[in-house]
Amino acid sequence: MSHIFKKQLRKILFVAASTLLLVACNSSAPPSTTATSGDKPATSSSTATPVNNSDKKSKQDIRVQLPFLKQSTDAALIVAIEKGYFAEEGLNVTYERGFGNADTISKLGTGKYDIGFSDIYNAMEFNDKNPNDKIIAVGIYQNKGPYCILTFKENGIKTPADLVGKKIGAPIGDGARKLFPLFASEVKVSPDAVTWETMEPKLRETFLLQGKVDAVSGFYISIIPAMIKNGKTMDDLQIFYYDDFGLDFYGNGILVKQDFMTKNPEAIKSFLKAYFRGMQELVKDPSAALDLVISTDQSKLMDREAEKLRLKLGLERMYITPEVEAVGFGGVDPKRLEKSVAQTVTGFKLKPVTAADIFTDKFLPAKEQRMVPPVSDRKPLL
């Protein structure tokens, strides 16, 4: 019995010692995680992809407001975020949708956002009212303004002169509507010769389709895809592009408040470097960029064909122009910019300013870093 008891005791002591050793080993090991070295970090459609929390904290947060809902024409920003170009520059970039160019500038002016994507002409009007709190463009990503008047050929409006006596629909703050007096001057008609019908942006195309107005003003990158989606064809449309009638305006730019510009010069340089790198990627492979934008659409409501047409119009008429081929993405032709600024001063009845009061190129990357990729490197948009 004594022999059996001793044998059982040794067995119990062995099990206890093994248990204590296992506990000690586990307490000294690092805590386990659900990710492995091969896992992709969690991402969102509006946030750069940090590797971990400490890495995110080391980056400077940059808040961006878009001009409107996220669209395919925002592809350069999305590419730069999702491919980590901003993160490489030490930035954590987030964005939110906009509610029109004027609203984006207004919110940028309040300091809610660090960077706004909007046009310099609305910014000029803001600066006229807020001379001590100015907004400045640090780069232009749309070389041509998307302003137009659009109608149906069946309405019998074949030339701008045929707009006389007609009803044009647009939201009150619409850029093309605000610039209409300048357009009217160029085409030799009185700006008071038309009647304006005001509606919410989402109802603009509906009013035209229902015949409540004879034409609408707005951005052709918004109106044309909407019309095609509603069953119209390009042959059904009569479009008066403002830049075909003497208003050679720039489109949207990358805007900051003067105070932010003074305090964050390096962040602005880093943002522009990463953004125009994204633009180059967009031009090289627009189909991949389009698919990336759609993949980040959390609403799952994006129509790929409509967004494809929008991006096609942007690439052909706004992003890749002879001027951009010469000066690179983000730059301007000083004489052209000066002329459009002077036209805006006259049209908006503003205090005199120069191009230097609304635009600076001192934060742009070196020209060779933001050139348009050669044609041989560009894939078609499919």
Please give the residue ranges for each predicted region.
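Conserved C-terminal helix/tail region of periplasmic/extracytoplasmic solute-binding proteins
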Residues: 334-382
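Pocket-lining segment of extracytoplasmic ligand-binding domains
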Residues: 122, 203-206, 212-302
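Short, glycine-/small- and polar/acidic-enriched structural segments
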Residues: 38-41, 48-200, 205-210, 214-221, ...
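Bacterial N-terminal signal peptides that target proteins for export
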Residues: 2-13
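Secondary-structure end/capping motifs
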Residues: 263-349
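Bacterial signal peptide processing site
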Residues: 26-29
